């Protein structure tokens, strides 16, 4: 069959597809199925066109509906996108008829020429799979295939199928190793473009995890082949914006894989950057630079993670673009390629927007470009204008992400220093392998060890400071006690008529003087307590004595017989209307008690709603002295309407619930087991034998006696002396043993020992004195710190203005809450109430009165927030037992007195070895002096606590020092805990708020980015879409794939070149603005983690 007959036998070929002419089967019947060459099914109303030569007449005879239908079929066969069909469908009838005729003539001519050799898709596949054809014939076949793929309908492309795509893949793979296949590679990529110009072909390539087509296209990125690289960049960039199929990840993975096998994975973007600077001979119109820049914009704009975008951009810039950016700017400005200029503008906008977003994460951090350290200057000068500068800048940027934590920040820097040390000081005494980025660094426990060491160091330093403070406080109090003791001696000497030494020789110390007597005049004897008010009538009581604190004048004369006593002066503000005299005594009601010390009645608060009560025990004014804290307390000045209103709302009362009292376990008294200890000779001998078999077993009885005579405390430890005191037989037994020994009668070893040491006169007092000498330092150490702590704590409590303000504020809140109750208008409260503040909860049962107090102090009175810093000795004072101190002081005084008595009785040594007077005399002198000083310090502490009890109006005999300071400590610790709870809750709320804002911001940014990345094509449409690759390329070409960027919302900053010039100058900003520094973990994890 000739070529002409073969063409004729096709029955019109493409015309049959377009006009739906039914073909006759071998039996002569008309087939109603799908036509040949992928034609569409024939409908029942299709007309049969007799031949191609008659189609013009036939078109003229078509109705408008039929013409529209045929025109729509032609548009679909031409793969024209739907958004561009409207202008064509709006054409007039004559224009549409002409377009149909032109199209059919061209298709018919193309079909005749194409069918000269390749009739079906399988023909192309079989021909290209045959490797015996010459390069020229293969090129002609591929070029014809490209025309066929572009011209034929989708059904023809589907028939070409996966097998055809595989054939093109083999051609591309063969072209990599054959220089003569360069044109074939170019046409093969164009064939792939035609195949993927519909959703079916695009899904075939992008549905697999990694199709070989993507790898081959990535391998075609060679700047030495400009046309081929342009086509490959178009397809790869189009894949990146097919988000439904993860095209971006697949393209990036393909580029990385090819770079790892071809040159270096770390330089995967080098061909793309090199293409930007292709010569004029290779890229005269700068199309390659334009498509390379489009691809770079696609890579750096598509990811939603800012860190990843910055990382990619830094990697691309390190491939030489950073150094030659100014040169590329000149290339863009000199070119006439408007697309290149447009995409270079997009490149700068994307880069600046990402930098702006990066800077906005650290709005509270500013960089002082004029304040730099010498080390930074040296490093900056070393790397400036070198290839190391981008890496140095990247290191600085990474350092900004270190956690903002007091303990972990130094740990991070120490870890980084360790890494740099291992890299720079390489163990092989040479440069490390730069190709291998894995450095074996032991970091398993490094950070934890660093933090623990830092905490231990801080704790040790704090303990040292506290120890030094205690030593200074102890020395201060001891010096004051010594000065007081010396002053007493001076006064005693003056009273005895002995001239006192010069006062200049006395140390100048601040000795608290006794308080002045009450009253402004002289020093009269203390008056009896005032009588309570009495009702008028009856025998008149004697006139009341003058109130304490007022000038005492002569008492008024007694009233005449039968008359009542004169009424007391009216209270301020209590005068009768009109200023008339008060009624006669017989007509008066009960007398109002006169407030002492100039106290004024407390303000009664008008509270509208019932409130929870401050269950304190108010202090009666009559129990207060004129020096009491409550007399000077002016809590009304602290009142503010806003927080009192908040207090009324938060602590409004609800239906009273019966409080279930916690069962308090009664302390169980440990009954000592009464051991009936009987002193027997056998028991005494056994105890002495056990003692001698211990640390004294290497000494003879005579040597032990000599040690006792010499007072040798190096051998006689406190434990041995206590055992001797405990097990020593009574004096009559010792005397009896000495008599037996003197007669020369044999004695057992234990009795010989007892008889030997019994020869020492006053043995028992000697043992007690030696034991006192050894235990004296421990006894002093046991009570002296307590005395120092108690004294210092009393002074701190009395002098702390911050603590006084806290008490005033509590009095204000309590009086406000107790308005209308029996405890209202209290002048003071017992200090023990401080521990009960946490028992009062607000109306929501979520917060206590103590938490509210801590929050109120922080907001309204921040100067008093750290009042606990003024009470540094309260913790130790809470463990001070006054009875134990007094008992220890009595013991020491008694022991010193006994020692002094024994020294008087042992002035003459018993023998040459007797060193009692020599050894113990010096100790007794030092001990007496120190015990006297301790006694003065104890008296000073007791006096200060007594003054403190008068200051806060409590009974020191009922409210001991230990209980008082324990309550202060409990309140102080509870206040700190409440404040920490408030801070924690506030931080949690702030964190939630920031997290919500970050999520909303991230959602908005994600939505905006998704809007910019809105799918150009629907990859999951039920019907195959056409022209998808054209739409993707158009979106990239016009820049619509990168979205509409809001340039006005961004802060005005220097342009790219100017900013780079600024960064080139040594102006590293290191100072931080005032305000709370937003931590890296709080910003980065919330913004990126929620995305």
UniProtKB/Swiss-Prot annotation:
* Biased composition regions of type Pro residues, renumbered to the chain: 512-572
Q: What is its main location?
A: cytoplasm
Kindly state which keywords UniProt assigns to this record, in alphabetical order: Actin-binding, Cell cycle, Cell division, Cell membrane, Coiled coil, Cytoplasm, Cytoskeleton, Membrane
Q: Which residues form the DAD domain?
A: 1022-1054
Q: Which GO terms describe its cellular component?
A: apical part of cell; apical plasma membrane; cell cortex; cleavage furrow; cytoplasm; cytoskeleton; M band; protein-containing complex
Annotated ranges, domain FH1:
512-596
Q: Which is an annotated GO molecular function term of this record?
A: actin binding
InterPro entries per record: ARM-like, ARM-type_fold, DAD_dom, DIA_GBD_sf, Drf_DAD, FH2_Formin, FH2_Formin_sf, FH3_dom
Q: Which SUPFAM superfamilies match?
A: ARM repeat, beta-sandwich domain of Sec23/24, Formin homology 2 domain (FH2 domain)
Record-level GO BP terms: actin cytoskeleton organization; actin filament organization; actin filament polymerization; actin nucleation; actomyosin contractile ring assembly; apical constriction; assembly of apicomedial cortex actomyosin; cellularization
Q: Where is this region: Basic region?
A: 1-56
Function recorded in the entry:
Required for cytokinesis in both mitosis and meiosis. Has a role in actin cytoskeleton organization and is essential for many, if not all, actin-mediated events involving membrane invagination. May serve as a mediator between signaling molecules and actin organizers at specific phases of the cell cycle. Possible component of the contractile ring or may control its function.
Record text about domains:
The DAD domain regulates activation via by an autoinhibitory interaction with the GBD/FH3 domain. This autoinhibition is released upon competitive binding of an activated GTPase. The release of DAD allows the FH2 domain to then nucleate and elongate nonbranched actin filaments. DAD-mediated autoinhibition negatively regulates dia localization to the apical cell cortex. The N terminal basic region is enriched in basic amino acids that may mediate interaction with negatively charged phosphatidylinositol 4,5-bisphosphate (PtdIns[4,5]P(2)). It is required, but not sufficient on its own, for efficient apical localization in polarized epithelial cells.
Tell me the protein family, please.
Belongs to the formin homology family. Diaphanous subfamily.
Tell me the subunit arrangement: May interact (via CBD/FH3 domain) with Rho1.
State the protein's name.
Answer: Protein diaphanous
Q: Which species is the source of this protein?
A: Drosophila melanogaster
């Amino acid at each position: 069959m000739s070529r002409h007959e073969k063409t004729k036998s096709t029955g019109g070929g493409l015309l049959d597809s377009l006009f739906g002419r039914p073909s006759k089967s071998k039996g002569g019947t008309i087939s109603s199925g799908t036509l040949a060459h992928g034609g569409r099914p024939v409908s029942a109303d299709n007309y049969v066109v007799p031949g191609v030569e008659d189609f013009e007449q036939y078109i003229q005879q078509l109705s408008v509906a039929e013409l529209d239908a045929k025109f729509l079929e032609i548009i679909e066969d031409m793969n024209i996108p739907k958004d561009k069909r409207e202008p064509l469908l709006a054409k007039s009838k004559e224009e549409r008829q002409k377009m149909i005729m032109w199209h059919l003539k061209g298709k018919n001519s193309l079909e005749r020429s194409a069918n000269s050799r390749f009739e079906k898709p399988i023909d192309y596949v079989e021909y290209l799979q045959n490797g015996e054809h010459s390069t020229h014939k293969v090129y002609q076949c591929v070029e014809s295939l490209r025309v066929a793929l572009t011209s034929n309908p989708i059904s023809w492309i589907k028939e070409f199928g996966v097998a055809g795509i595989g054939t093109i893949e083999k051609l591309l793979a063969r072209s990599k190793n054959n220089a003569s296949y360069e044109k074939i590679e170019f046409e093969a990529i164009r064939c792939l473009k035609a195949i993927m110009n519909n959703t079916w072909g695009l899904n075939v390539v992008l549905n697999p995890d990694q199709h070989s087509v993507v790898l081959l296209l990535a391998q075609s990125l060679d700047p030495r082949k400009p046309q081929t690289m342009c086509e490959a960049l178009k397809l790869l960039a189009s894949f990146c914006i097919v988000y439904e199929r993860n095209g971006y990840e697949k393209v990036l993975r393909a580029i990385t894989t090819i770079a790892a096998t071809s040159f270096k994975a770390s330089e995967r973007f080098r061909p793309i950057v090199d293409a930007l600077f292709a010569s004029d001979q290779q890229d005269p119109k700068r199309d390659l630079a334009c498509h390379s820049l489009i691809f770079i914009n696609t890579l750096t704009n598509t990811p939603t993670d800012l860190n990843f975008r910055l990382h990619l951009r830094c990697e691309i810039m390190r491939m030489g673009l950073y150094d030659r950016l100014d040169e590329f700017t000149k290339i863009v400005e000199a070119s006439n390629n408007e697309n290149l200029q447009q995409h270079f503008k997009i490149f700068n906008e994307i880069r600046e927007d990402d930098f702006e977003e990066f800077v906005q994460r650290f709005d509270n951090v500013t960089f002082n470009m004029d304040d730099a350290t010498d080390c930074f200057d040296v490093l900056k000068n070393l790397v400036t204008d070198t290839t190391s500068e981008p890496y140095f800048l990247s290191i600085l940027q990474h350092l900004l992400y270190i956690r903002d934590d007091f303990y972990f920040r130094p740990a991070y820097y120490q870890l980084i220093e360790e890494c740099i040390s291992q890299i720079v000081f390489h163990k092989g005494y040479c440069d490390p392998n730069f190709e291998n980025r894995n450095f074996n660094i032991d970091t398993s426990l490094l950070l934890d060890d660093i933090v623990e060491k830092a905490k231990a160091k801080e704790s040790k330093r704090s303990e040292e400071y506290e120890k030094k403070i205690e030593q200074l406080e102890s020395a201060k109090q001891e010096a004051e006690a010594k000065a007081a003791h010396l002053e007493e001696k001076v006064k005693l000497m003056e009273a005895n008529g002995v001239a006192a030494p010069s006062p200049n020789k006395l140390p100048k110390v601040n000795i608290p003087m006794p308080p002045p007597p009450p009253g402004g005049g002289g020093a009269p004897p203390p008056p009896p307590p005032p009588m309570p008010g009495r009702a008028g009538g009856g025998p008149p009581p004697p006139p009341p004595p003058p109130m304490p604190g007022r000038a005492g004048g002569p008492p008024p004369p007694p009233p005449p017989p039968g008359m009542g006593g004169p009424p007391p002066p009216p209270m301020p503000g209590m005068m009768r209307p009109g200023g008339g005299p008060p009624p006669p005594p017989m007509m008066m009601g009960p007398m109002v008690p006169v407030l002492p010390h100039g106290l004024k009645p407390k303000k009664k608060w008008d509270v509208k709603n019932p409130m929870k009560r401050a269950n304190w025990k108010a202090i009666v004014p009559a129990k207060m002295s004129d020096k009491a804290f409550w007399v000077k307390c002016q809590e009304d000045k602290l009142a503010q309407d806003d927080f009192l209103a908040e207090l009324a709302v938060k602590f409004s009362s609800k239906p009273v619930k019966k409080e279930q009292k916690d069962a308090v376990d009664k302390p169980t008294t440990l009954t000592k087991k009464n051991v009936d200890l009987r002193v027997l000779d056998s028991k005494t001998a056994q105890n002495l034998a056990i003692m001698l078999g211990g640390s004294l077993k290497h000494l003879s009885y005579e040597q032990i006696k000599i040690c006792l005579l010499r007072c040798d405390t190096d051998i006689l430890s406190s434990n041995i002396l206590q055992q001797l005191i405990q097990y020593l037989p009574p004096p009559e037994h010792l005397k009896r043993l000495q008599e037996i020994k003197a007669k020369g009668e044999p004695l057992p070893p234990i009795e010989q020992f007892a008889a030997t040491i019994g020869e020492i006169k006053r043995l028992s007092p000697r043992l007690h004195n030696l034991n006192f000498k050894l235990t004296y330092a421990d006894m002093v150490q046991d009570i002296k710190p307590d005395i120092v702590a108690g004294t210092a704590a009393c002074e701190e409590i009395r002098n702390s203005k911050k603590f006084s303000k806290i008490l005033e504020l509590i009095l204000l809140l309590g009086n406000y809450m107790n308005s209308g109750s029996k405890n209202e208008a209290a002048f003071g409260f017992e200090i023990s109430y401080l521990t009960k503040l946490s028992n009062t909860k607000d109306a929501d049962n979520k917060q206590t009165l103590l938490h509210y107090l801590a929050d109120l102090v922080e907001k309204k009175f921040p100067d008093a927030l750290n009042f606990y810093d003024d009470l540094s000795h309260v913790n130790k004072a809470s463990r001070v037992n006054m009875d134990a101190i007094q008992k220890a002081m009595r013991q020491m005084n008694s022991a010193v007195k006994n020692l002094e008595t024994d020294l008087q009785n042992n002035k003459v040594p018993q023998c040459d070895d007797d060193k009692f007077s020599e050894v113990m005399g010096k100790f007794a002198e030092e001990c007496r002096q120190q015990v006297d000083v301790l006694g003065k310090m104890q008296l000073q502490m007791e006096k200060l606590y007594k003054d403190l009890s008068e200051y806060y109006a409590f009974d020191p005999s009922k409210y001991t020092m230990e209980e008082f300071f324990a309550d202060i400590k409990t309140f102080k610790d509870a206040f700190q805990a409440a404040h920490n709870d408030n801070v924690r809750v506030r931080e949690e709320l702030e964190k939630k708020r920031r997290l919500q804002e970050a999520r909303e911001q991230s959602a908005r940014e994600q939505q905006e980015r998704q809007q910019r990345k809105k799918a150009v094509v629907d990859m999951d449409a039920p019907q195959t879409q056409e022209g998808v690759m054209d739409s993707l390329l158009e979106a990239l070409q016009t820049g619509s794939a990168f979205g509409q960027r809001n340039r006005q919302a961004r802060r005005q900053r220097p342009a790219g070149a100017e900013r780079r010039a600024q960064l080139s100058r040594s102006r590293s900003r290191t100072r931080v603005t005032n305000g709370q520094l937003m931590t890296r973990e709080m910003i980065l994890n919330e913004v990126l983690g929620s995305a």
